[in-house]
């Protein structure tokens, strides 16, 4: 059994705990703190998968996870303050992050094997949608966009993307994304009887 593959699975289990928990949280600053910790372990999992199955097919995912960790930590600080100044800073930071994501995403797509570029292109589009969804007010945008993003990432952890090595499926990578989707479902089941609760209103951007 490939040691790096096993390490990736262990890091994935840790990631699941943080990611599932984060989508049960309605407070934005607390959400960003918990999900930033999860993103750090998520990044580690992709690095380990890169050593196990080929770094070039995991590079865009490592970039995305690193970017996610930094972004979530900054947004955590911004939403914790929740002042007009911090909101303006947050909007400027969001625009910078979108620019960085575009550049990094295009570079990763260009460097990816030709067979999987279409998949990484979809991943970049889904990731950008998620970044915007995270920043938008309320609890719904982030959950809708993370579901789309998770579905695309699941595809990157299958033989569609893992071209080299002995392992054709990253089961833990798939489990993490399924945990996010499951957490969103559980969240809405929990609050299904409270649609008029202020924090559950569909906020205007």
Region locations from a protein language model:
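Alpha-helical membrane-protein topology signature
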Residues: 1-205
């Amino acid at each position: 059994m490939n040691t790096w593959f096993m390490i990736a699975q262990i890091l994935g289990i840790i990631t699941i705990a943080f990611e599932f928990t984060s989508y049960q949280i309605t407070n934005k600053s607390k959400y960003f703190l918990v999900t930033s910790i999860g993103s750090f372990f998520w990044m580690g999992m992709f690095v380990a998968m890169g050593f196990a199955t080929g770094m070039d097919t995991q590079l865009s995912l490592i970039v995305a996870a690193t970017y996610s960790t930094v972004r979530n930590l900054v947004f955590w600080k911004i939403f914790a303050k929740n002042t007009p100044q911090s909101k303006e800073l947050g909007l400027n930071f969001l625009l910078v992050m979108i620019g960085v994501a575009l550049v990094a995403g295009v570079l990763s797509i260009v460097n990816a094997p030709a067979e999987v570029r279409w998949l990484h292109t979809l991943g970049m589009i889904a990731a950008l949608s998620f970044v915007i969804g995270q920043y938008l007010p309320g609890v719904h945008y982030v959950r809708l966009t993370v579901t789309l993003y998770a579905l695309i990432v699941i595809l990157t952890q299958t033989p569609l993307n893992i071209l080299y090595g002995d392992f054709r499926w990253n089961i833990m990578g798939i489990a993490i994304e399924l945990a996010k989707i499951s957490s969103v479902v559980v969240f809405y089941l929990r609050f299904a009887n409270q649609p008029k609760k202020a924090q559950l209103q569909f906020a205007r951007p």
